[in-house]
């Protein structure tokens, strides 16, 4: 039998007459709908939109007269009707007909023109109680005919369902009996369904990892998964990947959606596949396999924002299978538990770590909920405690820089003088020049830092706009600072507006350092949410109203009433206003859009006056417009803004703490990755032996120790690694879980460890 991976054999199909032209047969059946027809429909038949082909006409030497139709002839409609009904007796005479006409069941004559659906797929699509009696006869007929392209491995050929095979359909129909029948007859268990319908994208689709094993896992068919992995004919490989490099574990991560029903399905299947992999291929670490984006299943969950499966992988603990666990219970006493978490792929000391993915590359707007999961929460807190001095040093440097900035801006020379200070040996000018140079250097430093920040997040900056709020303001401050200083040294007076704008942004950006404290940090988060969610929308609508009413008032003011122009030699003098009349008359006129907008803004904040010139021609219309503007803006929009801001504060109150945690995490990683901080990153945790590997060697991992109090499951008996929190000989002590370098050994061979007292539980 031809192997599934063998290349197609070139051959010419035969034509024995009687085939209907595709355009005539399908006339009136064209699909004018917005979507493509499904693979199988009881309301629409298969089409005949075949691509042009060169065939051998078997009736070439026969007479040209009209011939009677052959009653033994099998066309596609007869074959499809027989297999869809599941009546194998209707296939009598099919082997003889195929042998007589040199045809195969995979010829285009027996497939659907647009999709390439075969009679075997048609039979599998029409199962009754999980079986179809025509499947086995079709496979036997195809095998006996010597088909160089076996029917069992035929796939759909269109862009939408490309690669879809009968085995995929049998798995989707949840028929283990049909799956066994196909695999026993040579079905390719690694066939890839890579059409657009099976790719993750916009619109209706179902991405399951393309492979039959992934489809069975994603549809919760453990019996099919077990058979595919352990069948004696062609066992499926857990290491097989799809066109994106994703394994079955990656596919399970992709289909998770954080709902209770879905996560129960995904986690049970995920754990089952890990245990099956440990039994079938113990030397392979399935969770270390990376896809084409260089992501493991854990990193993929972090990047896609799959919170629940991410939590499950991080906190997975198997009893008796320590080499598959990422969490280990070291010691417990009542509800108090000391747990060890595996930091592989998590700590920022590694390239493309989970922490960096969440902070800089995650697509989900809810990624702030991942940084509060253990061990990330305590790990980030430990890093923060270590980097607090650097954080406040940055704050002190920025504060000094802003004082220098303020002093230079306050002592600027008048615009009539030269903008840049004279290079004379005077104390005032020298200090002013030095201040300008320091401001320029600080602006360049800040600009380079922010450009590097946005370069690292160039794809996802708009997705995570909320936590990049200050970084965007810092970027604008740096740009304004550099441009203003360049204009200053070029003696261009427009440097001053840019300078004071940068000064205002600089003082506002000092609020960035409020994230170092919980109360001010959460308050800052709420301010950002209100600005980005409510205030921006209010300003957009308000500007539309303001521009429309301003243009209307300017147009009406141009039609002010004037006396009729007299005739005679004194005509010019009679139309000129009296002394003081021009100022009085033009004071209330809306002579331009800017003046009208300023007057209307006064109405918005309740400071406008309805007094206007008596000589306005459309006095009533102007009054009506002003009243309408007051109703729409001062009464409607402002009160709506207040209500929306209150709702926003209430809705984000539960997430403000986690968003603040995420902002702290970004600050921690930025301080670790500082372009001027040339110190090597410190690794967190400690190297411990948590068990043995399948080959008997010790299982050593970098672990991070976390103290937890869990009243929900404290009655469970869990295996522990030691009898007390720190090991024998050191009562009531616990190794410091903060950042640590690899332990050094002293002369006696004992490792140097820092110990801190265990926090005691106190009850009132």
From Swiss-Prot:
Residues 1-390, 456-471, 515-537, 643-764 are cytoplasmic. One of its GO terms (molecular function) is monoatomic ion transmembrane transporter activity. It is found in: Cell membrane; Cytoplasm; Melanosome. Gene3D superfamilies: Ankyrin repeat-containing domain (1.25.40.20). Calcium-permeable, non-selective cation channel with an outward rectification. Seems to be regulated, at least in part, by IGF1, PDGF and neuropeptide head activator. May transduce physical stimuli in mast cells. Activated by temperatures higher than 52 degrees Celsius; is not activated by vanilloids and acidic pH. GO terms for cellular component: axonal growth cone; cell body; cell surface; growth cone membrane; melanosome; plasma membrane. SUPFAM superfamilies: Ankyrin repeat (SSF48403). Pfam families: Ank_2, Ion_trans. It is a multi-pass membrane protein. Keywords: ANK repeat, Calcium, Calcium channel, Calcium transport, Cell membrane, Cytoplasm, Glycoprotein, Ion channel, Ion transport, Membrane, Phosphoprotein, Repeat, Transmembrane, Transmembrane helix, Transport. The chain crosses the membrane at residues 391-411, 435-455, 472-492, 494-514, 538-558, 622-642. Residues 412-434, 493 are extracellular. SMART domains: ANK (SM00248). PANTHER family: TRANSIENT RECEPTOR POTENTIAL CATION CHANNEL SUBFAMILY V MEMBER 2 (PTHR10582:SF5), TRANSIENT RECEPTOR POTENTIAL ION CHANNEL PROTEIN (PTHR10582). This is Transient receptor potential cation channel subfamily V member 2. It comes from the Eukaryota. Residues 1-388 are annotated as: Required for interaction with SLC50A1. Residues 572-609 dip into the membrane without crossing it. ANK repeats lie at residues 72-114, 115-161, 162-207, 208-243, 244-292, 293-319. Homotetramer. Interacts with a cAMP-dependent protein kinase type II regulatory subunit (PRKAR2A or PRKAR2B) and ACBD3. Interacts with SLC50A1; the interaction probably occurs intracellularly and depends on TRPV2 N-glycosylation. GO terms for biological process: calcium ion import across plasma membrane; calcium ion transmembrane transport; positive regulation of axon extension; positive regulation of calcium ion import; positive regulation of cold-induced thermogenesis; response to temperature stimulus; sensory perception.
